[in-house]
Curated annotation (Swiss-Prot):
It comes from Mycoplasma mobile (strain ATCC 43663 / 163K / NCTC 11711). This is Small ribosomal subunit protein uS8. HAMAP family: Ribosomal_uS8_B. Coiled coil: none annotated. It comes from the Bacteria. GO terms for molecular function: rRNA binding; structural constituent of ribosome. Keywords: Ribonucleoprotein, Ribosomal protein, RNA-binding, rRNA-binding. One of the primary rRNA binding proteins, it binds directly to 16S rRNA central domain where it helps coordinate assembly of the platform of the 30S subunit. The gene is rpsH.
Amino acid sequence: MSRVITDPIADMLVRIKNATARKHKNVLIPFSNKKSKILEIIKDQGYIFDFAIEGDSVKKNLNVTLKYKNNISVITGVKRISKPGLKVYSSVEDLPMVLNGYGIAIISTSKGVLTDKQARKENVGGEIVAYIW
């Protein structure tokens, strides 16, 4: 029996958070292009080791390899900001700084999915997807 996921991005973040709490090496997440782009940012920022697309064209999954330092997860927290029922947008001037720059905000912009630093550099605002620290 499959379950209906109303917020796939939040589901992905919770799966990662739960897997790091249990010190799992990998976590499987149902595939979507947006999740793949978000994971690419998380990887580039050094919060996960790697991820790969697995499965056939009908049932694809993202296999995320989590990153640990001295047996402690590199990801200490995640927070979903913009939700399906309440979208949160920000102009470039009002983009948040997560933990004074120690974390990242993931922003969905007209130029693609970017970190808060990249969005400031590109001078674009957008939908604040999540915070990771």
